[in-house]
From Swiss-Prot:
Organism: Janthinobacterium sp. (strain Marseille) (Minibacterium massiliensis)
Pathway: Amino-acid biosynthesis; L-lysine biosynthesis via DAP pathway; (S)-tetrahydrodipicolinate from L-aspartate: step 4/4
Lineage: Bacteria, Pseudomonadati, Pseudomonadota, Betaproteobacteria, Burkholderiales
Full protein name: 4-hydroxy-tetrahydrodipicolinate reductase
Enzyme class: oxidoreductase
CDD domains listed in its UniProt record: DHDPR_N (cd02274)
Enzyme Commission number(s) of this protein: 1.17.1.8
């Protein structure tokens, strides 16, 4: 069995730990590298030290050392860090699985450009459940296009730095697309003060931050006499890690190109 040679960015973080543990448990994957910022106290330590069973892979801040033996980099960090990793990976033919959120238009354009040089999986959420939910939302939006108000409510832990979440924005894009609209034309990102009556064509967003919430997303279709709620709630980051490995398997035979989890799951 050919082994997927995978490195993890943000190796000392919560998601980094989950990815490392999942890779070490997989039969078809090998942890071959680990990256973190130079200021991290974890640099120089074994990437699996937190498990009490060293993996023989040190956490590096130098890209050349951290990625020397890897075919894939899984990155759930921050946009500025991911874009640095992206430049290196594109230049050295290393495939990327990007779960980082919060990119601006320029960042997304850089990812698309890099995909002409290497294969990239870019998705705001790697969970299989979330991506099946996206398909359900597309179907629902087409059937609740008239007379229903659409609101997207998301909740995450206190440490999350971007809002709304990338998953919530993607849900909005899917719904808007199903209605033949652009999200930026209909989105109401926040409400405060005297806002007036609701625009029936709008898609509203509400954000909650607190505690250790992994990620909850609910889309409300509110009509007269009924309301429909489609929800996904994450209880562990392991679903993101399993989805990331599934993405790596999908990319294994790809040379270049930009993909997302809808491609992996055959939901196009």
């Amino acid at each position: 069995m050919n082994q997927l040679k995978i490195a993890v960015a943000g190796a000392s973080g919560r998601m980094g730990h989950m990815l490392i543990e999942t890779i070490l448990e997989a039969q078809d994957a090998t942890l071959t590298g680990a990256l973190d910022i130079a200021a991290s106290p974890a640099v120089g330590s074994d990437a699996a030290a937190f498990l009490g069973k060293p993996a023989g892979v040190l956490i590096e801040s130098d890209f050349a050392k951290g990625l020397a033996n890897s075919e894939f980099l899984i990155d759930f960090t921050r946009p500025e860090g991911t874009l640095q990793h992206l430049e290196y990976c594109a230049a050295h033919n290393i495939k990327m699985i990007i779960g980082t959120t919060g990119f601006d238009a320029a960042g997304k354009a850089a990812i698309a450009a890099a995909a002409e040089k290497t294969a990239i999986m870019f998705a705001p959420n790697m969970s299989v459940g979330v991506n099946v939910t996206m398909k359900l939302l597309e179907m629902a939006a087409k059937n609740f296009s008239e007379g229903y108000d659409i609101e997207i409510i998301e909740a995450h832990h206190r440490h999350k730095v971007d809002a709304p979440s990338g998953t919530a924005i993607k849900m909005g894009e899917v719904i808007a697309g199903a209605l033949g609209k652009e999200l930026n034309d209909v989105a109401v990102w926040a409400r405060e003060g005297v806002t007036g009556a609701r625009d029936p064509s709008s898609i509203g967003f509400a954000t909650v931050r607190g505690g250790d919430i992994i990620g909850d997303h609910t889309v409300l279709f509110a009509g007269i006499g009924e309301r429909i709620e489609i929800s996904h709630k994450s209880s562990s980051r392991v679903s993101y890690a399993h989805g990331s490995l599934r993405a790596a398997r999908f990319l294994a035979d790809k040379k270049t190109g930009l993909y997302d989890m809808q491609d992996v799951l055959g939901l196009r």
